[in-house]
């Protein structure tokens, strides 16, 4: 599989984390052989869970499911394996929780024995979103994320827009939420990066997170 497909898959998981509340952790470990292991632990926030349930209520009624799962572990595992990733592990013990781990070589991760650099490029997120099916894009449409739409908004304007449509509870929830990113070099050197959710949603340029 080509490198873009791997970028798309990571972009999908990163975009997903932007709506999962404060229970999101990502660990990237550089291996001596040049591969990287990525582990993600995601948990939907209560507010986002409520918004998803309300937004899909009509479809759920048609399918006869009151509370369908949000994550389908087998399908996610198959997609990651088909992209050429190794040691793929995916589990979802509850409808609001997802644990993912896999190993591979990625163009957006560069590292040596004592160094590691992760590049988040909004262009790869946009390209990925346009290639996805209607289900994922429907979720993205709900939140009108500037990283996807390309619209130039101030942080204040974006939060006010979300509050006007979905209520202040949701906008406040996103405003205080973070992605807890941990990088670990091949030598075991670690560094933590708390990334504000809103900063990711409004990503409009390449961001680098590094251990040197």
Task: Go through the PLM ranges and name each one.
Residues 77-212:
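Mature, soluble, non-transmembrane domains
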Residues 18-21:
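C-terminal motif of bacterial Sec signal peptides marking the signal peptidase cleavage site
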Residues 23-25:
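Bacterial signal peptide processing site
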Residues 30-50:
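Post-signal peptide N-terminal segment of mature Sec-exported envelope proteins
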Residues 43-75, 139-140:
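Post-signal-peptide N-terminal segment of Sec-exported extracytoplasmic proteins
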Residues 1-9:
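Bacterial N-terminal signal peptides that target proteins for export
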